[in-house]
Amino acid sequence: MSEQEQFSIVVVKGSVRPGNYTGMAVDLLVDELRKMEGISIEVIDPIGMDLKLPGTGNSGSAERLQELVEGATGVILSTPEYHGSYSAAIKLVIENMGFPSALAGKPVGLLGVAAG
């Protein structure tokens, strides 16, 4: 990678529970990624966003989310495991990425967290 090349990674926190393990795992991941040269990181936390239910209109938060993802080289989605599936929070984030999705054509990494 040349000096001018830079990867831009968007990391999405997929849990809104206070003190959640998913957020802790994301923090560890981001700390490690920031040690690497040529990588910029943007963390998206849905807890501070005004994301709408699908079909009920768009919000400024959704537009900002779409801009960040469209401008990124890649995306990492994190989620706790809830009853064998992903969280409602990460689903809502994905639903607010527009149609066609801002994720289209992007490399996506998944960070799953399960306790117990």
Predicted features and spans:
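Short, structured loop/turn "capping" segments at alpha-beta junctions
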Residues: S101-K106
